Structures are given as structure tokens and as C-alpha cells.
């Protein structure tokens, strides 16, 4: 999120950024990956197929989604994974949710989205962020919904042994544009700052009374 503070008198405009692609976060587009040949046309066709699959998955997700009156549904997150090793890719549901959120915010259909992606228009994100898998051993503690500090358990017992808890966290990049303020804010008049914001996810934790259970805890989820 971008926080704006009191106006400033004079500050020079400087800084540079990189392309930000909602959802998959890749730079460039399929047309720029190679020259105008059969391979490029094949990649474009593959992209259309991929987006068609995403559209079907999102339609199915809307059908099985719980009613809006269910508050737990609003707290659901795909950023937690139980695995025996570090996941190599972002969670699929996270990519789908991020992609859907962008479409909803832009109020456009999937077909319109294909012809107006940020990579083609040269758009830049307001704040640069970084996403990575974090283990419970690295987090150690977290704050639950009641405001209490709880211990995040590293391993979760399963019928055939134990699995580690991994959290997919997103925070402001220290090497990006954050130090210069929010991109797009006129520094001659405003002082801005990119800040990491948090959301609730469900994880296996232990409170100060040694009671183990699944609780909603806060983790970094956006910048």
C-alpha cells in the first residue's frame, strides 16, 4: 500500500522502476520474447489456451464459493502450504486470486484483458514488492486475531509422519522503489512511503498456555 503524508515544498523527481505484470509477474509479453515467426505465434496460441483454462477455473470457483455471509470465507487464504520440502512455485490458487482481483478491479472481461495487459501499455507498479516462501522456523511467532502473540509450529503431524508449514509472504522490496517513495506520486508536493500490509491466514500454532490449535495469524501479504 502507498501512504501519503504532509505535502513537501521542493523535492526533485528521480528513481526508476521495472515492469509489473499482475498475477504471474513476468516482464515483457509474448510478442517481445522472440521475432515474428512460427514460434511466436505458437506462444501466443498457448497464452490464449492458458487464459481460457484460468477463465474456466475462476468460473468453477465462483460456483463452489461459500456465501458472502460466511465470514470465514473472507479470511480464507491460499498462502499456506504443508510440504516436506520448500515449494518451487507460488501457489496456484494465489495466482488465480491475484489474476481475478486484477480483472475485478479493472472491470474488464478476459478477452479485453488479453489486449490490454500492463506489459503492452508500459505500466509500472506503485510500489515494488518481493514474494517468497517462509518457514515457520523463520517466523517463530505471529499475532493472532485476538492480538495475542502465538508460537508458529514448524511441523504439522499427518498420518504418515510430519509436514512443514510454509507461508507465501509478500512485502516491500528494500532494493526497489520503496526508498524513493511511491511511484507516480509527485515528490514536489507530497511525501509518500511504500509500506508492507498484512492479512490473516490459518496456521497451526501454540499459545502461551501451551494449547495447540489452528488459529488465524497475520503475515505479510502485500506492499
UniProtKB/Swiss-Prot annotation:
The keyword Phosphoprotein does not apply. One of its GO terms (cellular component) is extracellular space. Keywords: Cleavage on pair of basic residues, Disulfide bond, Glycoprotein, Growth factor, Secreted, Signal. Disulfide bonds join 127-194, 172-223. Glycans are attached at residue 107. Its main location: secreted. Residues 1-5 form the signal peptide. Promotes the survival of neuronal populations that are all located either in the central nervous system or directly connected to it. Belongs to the NGF-beta family. This is Neurotrophic factor BDNF precursor form. It comes from Exiliboa placata. The lineage of its organism: Eukaryota, Metazoa, Chordata, Craniata, Vertebrata. The gene is BDNF.
